[in-house]
Design a protein with these regions (language model features):
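Conserved N-terminal alpha-helix of the aminotransferase class I/II PLP-enzyme fold
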Residues: 39-91, 113-120
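Well-ordered beta-strand positions enriched in small/hydrophobic/aromatic, beta-favoring residues
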Residues: 151, 219-221, 317, 343, ...
Length: 427
């Protein structure tokens, strides 16, 4: 179906024909833990990766399979793996590349949970990270060590929607034989496909825009199929005979799907962050309306940014569509159709004013999720990024008067009227 447009692919890939068992047009929920093999030889072929198909519910599920094929197609990748959460997807992608005594280079302005994983949790497993200004290619190159295993970016940083130059960074990373991992949660494949700009691996928190309704956790890892694991020689778990899978080389067995096959067969098998069939089904419902929702998110965001930019109680709006934003040129390059419905602004005052503004909103829900059809708000410095030191917060342009908004799909008049209530409370 590669010749079809995005809006068609999001509805059909993975289930081009009705369900063969029931003739159902909708994707069924295959609520099972395990699968019957035809005979002993068939079972051995499945476990030996000689025959593709279901083995056990921790590894694969037919509902999950449709979700994986659909997201892989939307991103332009070779294969995908769905897991229990976005956090699991990010962790698996990093651990598939780096082990004890090895190193990651990461954009410093990333989601607080990803920052904590890289800065505090993975060092316990011997994986160190150097955080860099993603706009400074010299700083990125200087951070690369002989034992660096990947460069990690976000298409739109969280919470300020800053934008890295994926093309330039990918070219630099590839010069050093390194894959580039890009979190495209906020970008979505509808607006930007990182593989077209040199990235090698894409990860998503499917909980966000892909699901779109704040109902189900899920994560996705997408393999571009472009990175040559064998030629690199730096990733023996993928390229060499793997002793934990009877000597199979995933690069040989799975070809362009080697990366996600390695994660499925080794990391997911051993640590079990499996997505449930029901969550995969719910996320598929979200995928079917992804383009429609994103268009409405963008339309509303443009009007909110304009409203905030002209409000006397706003100190600064951090949105890359604004000409004064340092990433405005990159925004026009990577997001010609708009984007960044999750962004921040700095209210005049400090934490007290920020909290009072938030506490007087009615339509906006105060919660930690983003990218819901409902409008959301939070105070990053005391919640999502509260584990960061004051210095780390300032380094990410997060202050006590910073408020993060996730603009939903409600009527724009109601969204702006609600923001006015917040401002009225601090006048």
């Amino acid at each position: 179906m590669s010749n079809y447009k995005f809006e068609t692919l999001q509805l059909h890939v993975g289930q081009e024909q009705p369900d063969p068992a029931t003739d159902a047009r909708a994707v069924p929920i295959y609520q099972t833990t395990s699968y019957v093999f035809r005979n002993s030889a068939h079972a051995a072929d499945r476990f030996g990766l000689r025959d593709a198909g279901n083995i056990y519910g921790r590894l694969t599920n037919s509902t999950q399979d449709v979700l994986e094929k659909r997201i892989a197609a939307l991103e332009g990748g070779s294969a995908a793996l769905a897991v229990a959460s976005g956090a699991a997807a990010i962790d698996y992608a990093i651990q598939a590349l780096a082990g004890a005594g090895e190193h990651i280079v990461a954009q410093k302005t990333i989601y607080g949970g990803s920052f904590n994983l890289l800065a505090h949790t993975l060092p316990h497993y011997g994986i160190e990270t150097t955080f860099v200004d993603a706009h400074n290619l010299e700083e990125i190159e200087a951070a690369i060590k002989p034992y660096t295993k990947a460069v990690y970016l976000e298409t739109l940083g969280n919470p300020n929607s800053d934008i890295p130059n994926i093309d330039a960074i990918s070219e630099l990373a590839h010069k050093h034989g390194l894959p580039v991992v890009v979190d495209n949660t906020f970008g979505t494949p509808y607006l930007i496909r990182p593989f077209e700009h040199g990235a090698d691996i894409v990860v998503h928190s499917a909980t966000k825009f892909i699901g779109g309704h704040g109902t189900s956790l899920g994560g996705i890892i997408v393999d571009s199929g472009n990175f040559d694991w064998k030629a690199s020689g730096r990733y023996p778990g993928i390229s060499d005979p793997n002793p934990s899978y009877h000597g199979a080389s995933f690069a040989d067995v799975a070809g362009p799907a080697a990366f996600v096959t390695y994660i499925r067969a080794i990391l997911l098998r051993d640590t079990g962050a499996a997505i449930s069939p029901f969550n995969a089904f719910i996320l598929l419902q979200g995928v079917e309306t992804l383009s429609l929702r994103i268009d409405r998110h963008i339309e509303n965001t443009k009007k909110v940014v304009e409203f905030l930019s002209n409000h006397p109680l706003v100190e600064k709006v951090n949105h890359p569509s604004l000409p004064e934003h340092p990433d405005h040129a990159l925004y026009e390059k990577y997001f010609p159709n708009g984007g960044a419905s999750i962004f921040t602004f700095n209210i005049k005052g400090g934490q007290k004013e920020a909290h009072k503004f938030i506490d007087n909103l009615e339509i906006f829900s105060l919660l930690a999720n983003v990218a819901d059809v409902k409008s959301l708000v939070i105070h990053p410095a005391t919640t999502t990024h509260s584990q960061l030191t004051d210095e780390e917060l300032a380094d990410q342009n997060i202050y006590q008067n910073t408020i993060r908004l996730s603009i939903g799909t409600e009527h724009i008049d109601d969204i702006i009227a609600d923001l006015e209530k917040g401002f009225a409370a601090i006048k």
